[in-house]
């Protein structure tokens, strides 16, 4: 609606919901996780497909799906990824978990996506928290992530200049200047 002919100048149409702030919905976070899964098990076709898909979604959205999912051919698959990632797989896998995360962000240039920076920072905080509380193990982190990914989101202040979409259960007890209840 924001970009339609019916949008009125001077009005903001930004919307925020709990689901839109979840880390598992961020493209950059999913690319990081795909790269981590691939480093953990390069022979896993699903890990290769996920990495290929997430990379194409961010950097090559016009690329045909037949090319994106042609992951059985290792050389073709790796030719589409950054050279620094493909040639240093062995040394990347040996890095401590937090350092691996930062290195992958740098290799894939994920910090260049301004709308995703809050998600990356929140994900890095989770990695650091896991690293300091649990252990420095990529496999354990990925397992923990699968169990907890739906609970992790970017925290925003109440001063966000956007319409907040809440369920009645989440909104119970809260006060807002304006409330819209659809029927």
Predicted region positions:
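Conserved motor-region signature of P-loop NTPase helicases/translocases
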Residues: 1-48, 106-111, 118-151, 155-180
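Core structural elements
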Residues: 1, 92-108
């Amino acid at each position: 609606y924001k970009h339609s002919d019916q949008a009125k100048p001077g009005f903001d149409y930004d919307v925020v919901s709990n689901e839109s702030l979840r880390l598992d919905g961020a493209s950059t976070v999913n690319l990081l996780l795909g790269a981590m899964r691939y480093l953990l098990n390069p022979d896993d076709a699903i890990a290769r497909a996920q990495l290929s898909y997430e990379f194409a979604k961010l950097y090559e959205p016009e690329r045909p799906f037949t090319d994106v999912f042609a992951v059985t051919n290792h050389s073709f698959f790796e030719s589409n990824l950054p050279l620094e990632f493909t040639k240093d797989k062995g040394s990347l896998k040996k890095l401590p978990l937090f350092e691996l995360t930062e290195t992958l962000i740098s290799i894939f240039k994920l910090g260049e996506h301004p709308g995703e920076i809050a998600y990356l920072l929140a994900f890095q905080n989770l990695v650091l928290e896991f690293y300091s509380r649990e252990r420095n193990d990529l496999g354990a982190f990925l397992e923990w992530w699968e169990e907890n990914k739906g609970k992790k989101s970017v925290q925003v202040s109440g001063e966000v200049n956007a319409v907040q979409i809440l369920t009645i259960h989440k909104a119970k007890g809260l006060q807002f200047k304006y409330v819209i209840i659809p029927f």
